[in-house]
A protein has these predicted regions:
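Bacterial N-terminal signal peptides that target proteins for export
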Residues: 2-13
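Post-BTB helical module
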Residues: 84-85
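Primarily short, surface-exposed interaction patches in extracytoplasmic proteins
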Residues: 48-80, 90-120, 134-565, 569-574, ...
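Active-site beta-strand/loop architecture of penicillin-binding DD-peptidases
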Residues: 356, 595-619, 628
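Bacterial N-terminal signal peptides
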Residues: 12-21
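N-terminal pre-domain segments of enzymes
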Residues: 25-59
Length: 741
């Protein structure tokens, strides 16, 4: 990936941001095509025309419902709102100044284009997808082969490449093979062992239709029957989350051959023998990495044993049928899954386009044209039917390009108005006099702290070298296994069974020693034995793969060890000394572990679709009062600290704090209050001595540098620094900081 040099944002005379140098003229996504800038794909003139059409529809609604649109927001509010909405974080001090100091009337449109083209937008959009698809770095299905990580990176690549929404949906639904062949198979592995739930998750995400209740009985609050649920689920029920590898069948036949000609008693005795069981376990271990993926089979779906309705009998085999519209007829060369994906994402599907258009509207304005966005019913009444119909048509016309669609919405006048503090309720339509006032999401809040604490936060990306290496090695392992016949594989398994027996004895011995150490409360011995046990267990895991691949093969890579260290930060001098965990939320494991800042502030646990929360809580207040994140924000080389130190006067420093944290100028009263707070600390600083007149030339320059260094030291450490940190702490604990206005 290209590393780009940061430059402050500047505006041309024409009013367009000259930002191509900030992130390169194009961005190349991993394994993807060169991505064009948004203005290359579609001219701004066309975008503004579409935005004006939406303005007109909203204006009609204002008149009809006697709604007064809110006043235009000021520049400081707009730059902060745009960054939080599009980039997922507050603007930096430099980015804030660049916008506020520019007088061009087209600067908001230009900023929108710049942000949509930036890696910051990719980060924020990934978080949106992660909530929608319940992404988990360590998901249950296929975790043994890194399927969760592969799925996460597949979604990141789709975002970077700006794949159209309908294309993303089709690729997820039709994914098949191993994670190293197609990371999108994580869509099925995410719901491993739960194919019926996978279908109801699909309809909720892509059709805004909640069918989960109909899995066990007819839906009590909607029209869906249990029969309709099962007919819909039949399309993808044949997709198994365990791959039926031909090699596995060969091995089964080889084992069956050993029992051929034996009596029932002899066969039972053989298959129960320890040697036979060890051999089967050994071959199972060799095949284990090749078990996880999405495999299309002829498996048929049956009704449950307790089906209670008169239209069929329990355990009847069910034929696939859509929940609405005409029957799906697969085209030539298509199977039922392909046809199902085409039906799901068709532009004339009555719900697919409507739902994504509404989701995107909510992402920009905080409230959907209909709510909830994922519980669309026949009796759902949108707050503005004309607007919803227009948004659907626009989405189709833009070929489901979410970036271009959002680009139109961010240029709608309502986005530039003051935020509405009106309480949003389901029984009262919201007519969008301005965006809804909202608390920051967990990811926005974390990423905003990271912006204050870390230079170039958008460029500190998780290093995918380790994952790529693991996927490459798994592909090599698969290829080698395919070349082994059953006889050779069984021979290797016999060797593996013997080795495994010896390793198992070693593990048993260590377990006994651990029990003795625990009884004697010998903590040092316990720690040592745990390490030993882990090493032996890893030896057991890798011994079978080593038999297949040979001693030269890096077998540890199959289990996520080996080349690559996870964070490019460890190799980049720009982040030397910064915590390896100080990265944007999109680059951390998803979801974050319990107790992490992100989880405390409502990040989804990724168990349920869009399960994040923005509700305030006592633990959040305590985290903002005393959180360890402040250590990073206040450290000497954080962007916030460096900008404060560079400012010359106390008044300038207060201004830097406000522009960095709240992204606005302090009022005269705020500035005066802060200076009063600083007075005592400033009184302890000795005045700078005058430069002796006899010092000339280089000596004079050297002495001035010494004075400047001394000044910076005084303001970086001691009571003065603590005083400025106190002001920063106060600003970070205001509602102005934690809300998107």
């Amino acid at each position: 990936m290209k590393t780009n040099t940061f430059r402050p944002l500047v505006l041309s005379a024409a009013g367009l941001l000259a930002v191509s140098t900030a992130f390169g003229n194009a961005f190349t996504a991993p394994d993807g095509p060169v991505r064009k800038e948004v203005k290359e794909v579609r001219p701004l003139k066309a975008v503004l025309k579409d935005a004006k059409a939406i303005d007109a529809i909203l204006q009609k609604a204002y008149a009809k419902h006697e709604v007064t649109p809110l006043p235009a927001a000021d520049d400081a509010t707009l730059v902060r709102r745009a960054y939080l909405a599009i980039a997922g974080r507050i603007p930096s001090y430099e980015e804030t100044l660049a916008y506020l100091e520019n007088d061009d009337s087209a600067k908001l449109s230009a900023l929108v284009d710049h942000l949509l083209d930036s890696p910051a937008h990719d980060s924020a959009t990934f978080n949106w997808w992660a909530d929608l698809l319940r992404l988990q770095t360590r998901q249950r299905g296929g975790n043994q082969v890194g399927a969760g990580e592969a799925y996460v990176h597949w979604v990141k690549d789709a975002v970077r490449q700006n794949l159209p929404f309908d294309e993303v949906a089709r690729r997820l639904i039709t994914a098949e093979g191993y994670p190293w062949e197609d990371g999108a198979v994580g869509y099925y592995l995410r719901d491993a062992g739960m194919p019926l739930d996978n279908m109801s998750n699909t309809t909720q995400v892509f059709l805004g239709t909640q069918m989960v209740c109909a899995q066990c009985h007819n839906h009590p609050f909607d029209k869906w029957t249990q029969m309709e649920y099962y007919k819909m689920a039949a399309y993808t029920y044949g997709v198994r989350d365990r791959v039926n590898n031909p090699k596995q069948r060969e091995l089964q036949q080889a084992f069956y051959a050993k029992t051929r000609g034996l009596s029932r008693e002899e066969r039972a005795k053989l298959t129960r023998s320890r040697e036979f069981q060890q051999l089967r376990r050994a071959t199972g271990e060799m095949m284990r990495p090749l078990q996880y993926g999405a495999d299309r089979t002829e498996r048929k779906l049956q009704l449950p044993h307790d089906y209670q309705y008169e239209d069929a009998k329990p355990k009847d085999v069910i034929a696939a049928a859509p929940i609405f519209g005409q029957a799906i007829a697969p085209a030539e060369g298509e199977d039922a899954v392909d046809a199902y994906a085409q039906w799901m994402t068709a532009s004339d599907n009555p719900r697919f386009t409507k739902v994504i258009a509404n989701r995107m509207w909510k992402r920009v304005f905080g409230v959907g044209v209909f709510e909830p966005v994922d519980d669309l019913r026949d009796d759902t009444v949108p707050s503005n039917p004309e607007l919803l119909e227009h948004l659907e048509a626009l989405m189709v016309r833009l070929d489901y390009d979410l970036k271009q669609f959002a680009r139109v919405l961010y240029n709608v006048k309502a986005f530039s108005r003051e935020a509405s503090a009106e309480e949003i309720t389901v029984d009262k339509p919201y007519h969008f006099p301005g965006p809804a006032l909202a608390r920051m999401s967990a990811e926005q809040l974390w990423d905003s702290f990271v912006t204050l604490a870390l230079p170039y936060p958008d460029e500190r990306l998780l290093d995918r070298a380790r994952l790529d290496y693991r996927m490459e090695q798994l592909a090599v392992y698969e290829e080698k296994m395919e070349k082994l016949d059953a006889k050779k594989l069984t021979g290797l398994a016999k060797k593996g069974a013997k080795a495994s027996k010896a390793i198992a004895a070693k593990m048993e011995r260590i377990q006994k020693q651990m029990a003795e150490a625990a009884e004697n409360d010998d903590r040092e011995a316990m720690a040592r034995l745990r390490r030993e046990y882990g090493q032996v267990r890893n030896e057991q895991r890798t011994s079978f793969a080593k038999l297949v691949m040979g001693d030269d093969f890096d077998v540890r890579s199959l289990y996520g060890y080996g080349r690559g260290n996870g964070a490019s930060a460890k190799r980049d001098p720009r982040w030397a000394g910064f915590s390896s965990q100080l990265m944007r939320a999109s680059e951390l494991p998803t979801p974050a572990p319990p107790g992490h800042f992100l989880r405390e502030f409502g990040q989804s646990d990724r168990e349920v679709i869009e399960n994040a929360s923005r509700e305030a809580s006592v633990p959040q207040a305590l985290t903002l009062l005393n959180g360890v994140i402040y250590r990073e924000v206040y450290r000497q080389n954080s962007p916030l600290s460096e900008n404060v130190v560079r400012a010359q006067t106390p008044k300038d420093k207060v201004r830097v704090l406000f522009l960095s944290i709240l992204n606005r100028e302090p009022t005269a009263e705020e500035s005066e209050t802060c200076l009063v707070e600083l007075k005592e600390a400033l009184a302890q600083v000795a005045p700078q001595p005058k430069v002796p007149e006899h010092l000339k030339g280089e000596k004079r320059k050297k002495y001035l540098r010494y004075l400047e260094k001394k000044r910076q030291t005084q303001q970086t450490y001691g009571p003065v620094a603590k005083a400025y940190q106190g002001i920063a702490w106060a600003l970070l604990n205001t509602r102005q900081f934690s809300f998107v206005q």
